[in-house]
A protein has these predicted regions:
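Active-site-adjacent segment of SDR/Rossmann-fold oxidoreductases
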Residues: 139, 160-170
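Residue(s) in the substrate-gating loop at a strand-loop-helix junction
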Residues: 134
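Conserved NAD(P)H cofactor-binding loop of Rossmann-fold oxidoreductase domains
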Residues: 82-87
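Conserved glycine-rich cofactor-binding loop
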Residues: 15-16
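C-terminal helical subdomain
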Residues: 167-170, 174-175, 191-231
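Substrate-binding pocket helix/loop in short-chain dehydrogenase/reductase
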Residues: 90-91, 98-100
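Active-site helix of classical SDR
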Residues: 114, 150
Length: 231
């Protein structure tokens, strides 16, 4: 298992939910974290934590964040894409704006982030990429097709990172949670909150993946709060 001391993790979506839980866990473990969020004022920077403006839907934002991270920390060892949106977009919606927004933020945002950080991940020889996908990226169980399509795309992106980065020591994992008790599932009424997975559960799994050596790579982690016989 790799020692976190001296390793720098770029983490989007750190202000809330899974991203916030992961940030706190990584800092406690001894990682340095570069947090990217749309409103940097929501977090207070300190020695091990730098806070940067980042909008996953804005072209050029990833490059600015990478530059700020290198200026502050001097290296990038891992990228965790935890930012995402989940408006409703069904197959029958004539207005495709929600589809476009999710494709831009959920699928293209992580791609732009990885591309911007790529040279630094290569340079460290043990680069790590973790993309927060969803069980909706493995099967379709409701009418929010737009969200599922964007998360299926994250699975494809993760596979390409594994293919393109393998010889450089880059390892990538797609983490696919079911319902997690965060504000993104506030609309879910048919599942009691206490039965859902906790953000801290997902954070623990991600930290474990980040610690794995190059000789033990996990392609996908499917995590659910209940038994599901379709997976």
């Amino acid at each position: 298992m790799m020692d976190p001391a001296g390793r720098v993790v770029m983490l989007s979506g750190a202000a809330r939910g899974i991203g916030r839980a992961l940030m706190e866990r990584l800092l406690a473990a001894g990682y340095a974290v570069s947090a990217g969020l749309r409103d940097p004022g929501r977090l207070a920077a300190h020695d091990a934590l730098s806070v940067h403006a980042y909008d996953a839907g804005l072209v050029g934002s990833a490059e600015e964040w990478v530059a700020g991270t290198m200026s502050r920390h001097g290296r990038i060892d891992a990228v965790v894409n935890a930012a995402g949106i989940n408006p409703r977009a069904t197959m029958f919606d004539a207005d495709e704006s929600a589809f476009d927004a999710m494709w831009n933020v959920n699928a293209k945002g992580p791609m732009r982030m990885i591309r911007a950080a790529w040279p630094h991940l290569v340079a460290c020889g043990e680069g790590r990429v973790v993309n927060i996908s969803s069980l909706s990226g493995k099967r379709v169980r409701n009418d929010n097709l737009g969200y599922a399509m964007s998360k299926f795309a994250v699975m494809a992106l993760t596979q390409e990172v594994r293919r393109a980065g393998w010889e450089y020591g880059i390892r990538a994992t797609a983490v696919c949670p079911g319902f997690v008790d965060t504000d993104m599932t506030a609309h879910v009424k048919h599942v009691p909150r206490e039965k859902m997975s906790r953000p801290e559960d997902i954070a623990a799994l991600i930290e474990a993946v980040l610690r794995l050596p190059n000789t033990a790579s996990v392609a996908e982690l499917l995590v659910n709060w209940r038994h599901e016989d379709t997976l």
